[in-house]
């Protein structure tokens, strides 16, 4: 459905899991995130040593074509059924030239304070994304997810993984 909407506009492209070239630069998108405390679990994955967060809703849900599938034991489901971030990253298209590659990833890498929460001393970035960017060394990576990070005492809006600039 989202692809059909994007197709209606000349300059709109869904880059989730895809590569799109603009003026010699390749943009590669990835919209998955680690588990969060909210009920809607679309695009949620896990990592090997990830500890699930306390949930704000007793029931989780994953969207289907008309509604959403209710999951009553989310913690058990998240341990056994969720894909791993590293596997999602392995499936991304490869850039032709890493020095002109820009990864657009919803979730930030761990350890860079791009995912710093305001009210907890917690950086909730992804270890797998950090390792992926460290190995691939693209020109740039762009992230969202924790929009308050630059406004926190310890948070940052820009950092580096070797030659890769992460924003």
Q: How would you label these PLM feature ranges?
A:
Residues 6, 93-94, 133-134:
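N-terminal cationic-hydrophobic initiation segments that often serve targeting/anchoring roles
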Residues 25-119:
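Active-site-proximal loop/helix segment associated with metal-binding centers of metalloenzymes
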């Amino acid at each position: 459905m989202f692809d059909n909407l994007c197709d209606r506009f000349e300059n709109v492209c869904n880059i989730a899991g895809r590569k799109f070239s603009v003026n010699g630069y390749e943009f590669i998108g990835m919209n998955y995130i680690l588990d969060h405390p909210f009920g809607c679990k679309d695009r949620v994955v896990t990592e090997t040593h990830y500890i699930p967060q306390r949930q704000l809703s007793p029931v989780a849900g994953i969207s289907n074509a008309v509604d959403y599938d209710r999951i009553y034991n989310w913690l058990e489901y998240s341990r056994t059924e969720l894909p791993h971030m590293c596997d999602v990253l392995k499936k991304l298209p490869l850039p032709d030239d890493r020095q002109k590659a820009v990864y657009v990833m919803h979730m930030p890498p761990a350890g860079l304070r791009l995912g710093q929460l305001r009210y907890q001393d917690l950086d909730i970035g992804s270890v797998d994304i950090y390792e992926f960017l460290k190995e691939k060394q693209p020109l740039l990576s762009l992230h969202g997810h924790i929009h308050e990070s630059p406004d926190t005492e310890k948070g940052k809006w820009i950092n580096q993984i070797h030659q890769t600039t992460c924003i």
